[in-house]
């Protein structure tokens, strides 16, 4: 499965050299991991298990909530563990995948410096301290980096891993659309003959629980339209991935260019943003929306953020909602005021 890239040749070799000096590796994904995090972590584990004697564990914070994400994790057949169950002292190396130190979207304690950082979001200053890092913000998916590593190291992924990697790249690039670069397309083409296309289709049509429809009903009820923007407060959510799912859905509305969904989970307000236009990067807009009150970032058309709740009162949450709304509309030029309900006439 050759996928040529001179940078990956050098990086893959250095990665293996580092791992050969370690006994145990903890691979930490972003909180509430998506298919890109899951597949990339599995690929890093495959590299470590194939070429070194290092023992690997994969951990995450939050939950694996979205049906497609659960399907990918289940198909890989690996033991993905909550980081709360992990004794970090038992691992002499830690890797961050699809996230970076102090990015606000992973549960690795700040005092623990990662040895390896693999990501495709803008480089953070803290990442420079890692002995090994490969951050390519132009890439649509971190899985693309791992596919290049596999190719350079002569490792052919089995059907479950190839399927997970292919789905991850397609998912994170909007099916090889505006977020994709040539490297993502090349990686997807290399994976396709190795993937289980029947399973790929099954992942995309994953079953959802009744709670999904409850959350959907609440999102529809609370969504308000401000010109070319939709903003929706989902209230309390059990599944943090619901914000992203609803944002994807609302962006399909005719004439809508920006969507912001937020909801409360585990003492924080989680935000998800989508846009169909390219005048401003969603990741940059999200950073400004949560400036001085939380953390956030992302890519050109998709972004996420989180803001801690100090009291969790209704007044605090309504105040944050107003802040999010006002800042977004100031950024993208939507109609201010109360807006109008997506459903109904008020």
Language model: regions and residue ranges:
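Short, basic, glycine/proline-bearing loop/turn elements
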Residues: 69-71, 88-91, 228-236
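Residues at the starts of beta-strands that form the adenosine-phosphate
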Residues: 24, 55-57, 93, 114, ...
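Anionic-ligand anchoring segments at beta-strand to alpha-helix junctions in alpha/beta enzyme folds, i.e.
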Residues: 22-88
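Active-site cofactor/cluster-binding pocket
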Residues: 71-132
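Low-complexity, glycine/alanine/valine/leucine- and proline-rich hydrophobic stretches
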Residues: 279-296
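A structured phosphate/pyrophosphate-recognition subdomain
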Residues: 2-32, 42-49, 125-268, 301-302, ...
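Primary mode marks residue(s) on the alpha4-beta5-alpha5 output face of response regulator receiver
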Residues: 273-274
